[in-house]
């Protein structure tokens, strides 16, 4: 996880419905997470560029740029591909779930969102993110050692 104020994970919540944003924000602040809000897919893409976001909760049905497209763009970029994404949507058909998975989402929740389920999934995704970061640092360290050994 990237360094944050007081080491709180930073979660970007993207939904064009402001009451939904505020509800999800309240759920996440209850578990001591920093939140940033976005009502638009293009705005969300801009907000992740600084590398400070640890996880994204992403609505699917938004005007201008769907959550599917936002997810696909984030997962195809080397800078953002490792940010976990939980899609949240009223779409529950198998085809919609398949489309979400094919766009690169890490998890999928149906609306209305259950607070306990959301919190559990967020904690799991953050734990996986931490382990992935540690693994990448370890692999870089091993690579450096191998390089030094080859040069000696």
Task: Kindly give the residue locations of the regions a language model identified.
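Receiver (REC) domain active-site loop signature in two-component systems and cognate sites
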Residues: 62, 74
């Amino acid at each position: 996880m990237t360094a944050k104020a007081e080491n709180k994970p930073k979660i970007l919540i993207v939904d064009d419905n402001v009451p939904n944003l505020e509800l999800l924000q309240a759920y996440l602040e209850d578990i001591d997470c920093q939140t940033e809000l976005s009502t638009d897919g293009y705005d969300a893409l801009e907000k992740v560029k600084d590398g400070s976001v640890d996880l994204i909760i992403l609505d699917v049905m938004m005007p201008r740029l769907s959550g599917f497209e936002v997810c696909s763009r984030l997962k195809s970029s080397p800078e953002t591909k490792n940010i976990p994404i939980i899609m949240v949507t009223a779409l529950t058909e198998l085809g919609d779930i398949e489309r979400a998975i094919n766009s690169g989402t890490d998890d999928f929740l149906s609306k209305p969102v259950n607070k306990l389920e959301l919190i559990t999934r967020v904690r799991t995704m953050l734990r996986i993110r931490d382990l992935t970061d540690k693994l990448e640092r370890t692999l870089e360290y091993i690579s450096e050692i191998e390089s030094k050994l080859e040069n000696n």
